[in-house]
Design a protein with these regions (language model features):
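C-terminal catalytic domains of large/alpha subunits in multi-subunit enzymes
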Residues: 1-189
Length: 189
């Protein structure tokens, strides 16, 4: 067997300088949500994503990877809850108890734009392409933050503590806490 070491990586922790990554894949996302104050249920209405793909090899595949990574992250932050018994047994260990996002959670308005950068300064990547499968997972933070902003709208000017994943129960609890103590700031996780 062999190994691969990405060339040119370095990091000096004493100085906080170096090149710890070969390149960066940047992106931005904006999410619009709707929250029911009585149940904590929410709907993702719209997502707009811009993701840096370098020089896209196959645009349709890149878009699918970006959408898939985003939806996976959305599940992690909104419904994929791990629950444990007092004895340490995982209680959410089956499809009936561990919820993942379905097509019903994906918004109809799901827009993905590709930012293309033909030449990557200093990087010798395959045909100029960049990673598009894993980085979009973090773009789903826009969903959780949109949910937090929606909950905060119930008590304007108040910071909101919202658990992750932001399940309907967590959203309902956050709204109930705002109603119980109006005007008091909650710690933001």
């Amino acid at each position: 067997t062999g190994f691969y070491r990405t060339p040119g990586l370095s990091w000096d922790p004493a100085n906080g300088k170096g090149s710890p990554f070969y390149y960066f894949a940047c992106g931005a996302a904006v999410s619009e949500v709707e929250v029911c104050a009585y149940t904590g249920m929410h709907r993702l209405l719209r997502v707009d994503i811009l993701h840096d793909v370098g020089d896209s090899l196959i645009e349709s595949i890149d878009r699918g990877q970006i959408e898939g990574g985003f939806v996976q992250g959305m599940g992690w932050l909104t419904c994929e809850e791990l629950r444990w018994s007092d004895a340490g047994k995982l209680l959410t260990d089956a499809p009936s108890t561990y919820k993942i996002p379905t097509v019903g959670e994906v918004p109809e308005a799901f827009r993905v734009a590709l930012h293309r950068q033909r030449k990557l300064p200093g990087a010798q990547v395959i045909f100029g392409s960049k990673a598009v499968g894993e980085p979009p997972l973090m773009l789903a933070l826009s969903v959780r933050e949109a949910l937090r902003a929606a909950v905060a709208a119930f008590a304007e000017g108040t910071a909101v503590a919202l658990a992750a994943p932001a399940t309907p129960e967590a959203i309902f609890s956050a709204i109930a806490a705002l109603r119980a103590a109006p005007g008091e700031a909650n710690a933001v996780p």
